Regions:
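Structural preference for solvent-exposed beta-strand-turn elements
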Residues: 1-371
């Protein structure tokens, strides 16, 4: 196998594929990526951890001989990152060693035969489409609410639903819940409906892929896998098994009080006051009064902080405690000039949402903290 490829093209595709490769593996070949010729003018780069697979095709400047070889993922990426901006020559030698040459640089890497690389899941094409920007928005607005606790398996990913009304993504860690829905990409009939649990790692890698792709994404699912096609790049992920909680039961239905804030002003105030919150609980206090919100935090060792934010609130005075980090993560991605804060009292879950959202439906439910 021998080919020549531009350094930029090689580095870009390696940056995506090596992201799914675990640095420490009990199966040595999984620390490698598979590079193989794909037709007369392209190469294919694949990486997997057996749960998530990314496959990228890249145009080669020339292919002198066809073939395939597995090479260390991280090492090749580090090399490509530091090479000069010049054509890269890649050649498989005898005994499965690989030579990489670029300008005055030359590297030799140990390779592994393709036969030892896991067989990758087959891709089943699907007519379902969703714009890259919409999918990225769904991920960015929900991924932070996925649990970090390894033991809570069914909460370690996002519920991804496609039906006749569009696409929904829901995540929760038991303390908060993020719900994002758009009317784009709806299913034509029951046979194309999707209801799956997608792992956090898959969403993180998918977010990276959408950042470099502007077109429509094709997607679909079978019994065990979900597929996302982004032009010449393909992501295949094993689904999570188990039953996601009934999130509709968590959505508050009797929150009869509401306050609206400038997103930027609220975000900056929360960020500043949180500097004095307890390092473990991140607890801050919201005191709502007529046309004003007082945010405060105190730490017995370091002091206290207070800041007021203008509001349109006209109800009774109310105190509510929140985890500042939970609020900040929502405010970072809400993408609206104003946000509405809906609640019943200081002991019930609150719901935050953007005032204007271009037809999308974004809700963030947060449990209060004891003060």
């Amino acid at each position: 196998m021998q080919f020549v490829i531009g350094r930029g093209a090689l580095q870009k595709e390696l940056s995506f594929v090596q992201g799914v490769v675990e640095r420490k593996n009990t199966i040595p070949v999984l620390a490698n990526i598979l590079i193989e010729s794909a037709g007369e003018n392209a190469i294919r780069i694949s990486g997997t951890d057996l749960d998530v697979t990314i496959r990228c095709d890249a145009d080669a400047e020339s292919i002198k001989s066809q073939g395939a070889i597995c090479v260390p993922a991280r090492k090749l990426f580090d090399i490509a990152r530091l090479l000069p901006d010049a054509p890269v020559s890649f050649k498989r030698e005898e005994n499965d060693w690989v030579t990489v040459e670029c300008d005055r640089s030359k590297f030799r890497l140990p390779g592994i035969s393709k036969e030892t690389f896991p067989e990758l899941p087959g891709f089943k094409s699907t007519p379902l489409k969703l714009s890259s920007s919409s999918l990225k928005s769904l991920i960015d607005r929900t991924i932070f609410a996925i649990t970090q606790e390894e033991g809570r398996y069914t909460l370690s990913g996002a519920k991804f639903e496609l039906d006749g009304n569009g696409v929904k993504m829901v995540t929760t860690d038991g303390h908060r819940l993020a719900f994002a829905a758009i009317k784009e990409g709806s299913a034509n009939d029951a046979s194309t409906e999707i209801d799956v649990l997608i792992p956090r790692k898959t969403l993180a890698e998918l977010s990276k892929l959408t950042s470099d792709f502007d077109g429509d994404i094709g997607f679909g699912a079978d019994e065990n896998h979900v597929y996302f096609q982004l032009g010449s790049r393909l992501l295949i992920s094993r689904m999570l098994s188990g039953q996601f909680p009934n999130y509709e039961m968590v959505m508050p239905k009797n929150n009869d009080r509401a306050a609206t804030f400038e997103t930027g002003a609220l975000s900056q105030a929360v960020r500043r006051v949180a500097l004095m919150a307890d390092d473990r609980s991140h607890a801050i206090r919201f005191h709502l009064s007529k046309e004003q919100l007082l945010i405060s935090a105190q730490n017995s060792d370091e002091g206290e902080a207070r800041e007021t934010v203008e509001s349109d609130y006209t109800g009774d005075d109310t105190d509510i405690g929140f985890n500042a980090q939970y609020l900040q993560e929502f405010l970072n991605v809400v993408g609206s000039e104003k946000v509405t804060f809906e609640f019943k009292d200081g002991n019930s879950q609150a719901q935050l949402r953007p005032v204007s959202d271009n037809g999308a439906d974004y809700k963030y439910v947060v449990m209060p903290m004891r003060l």
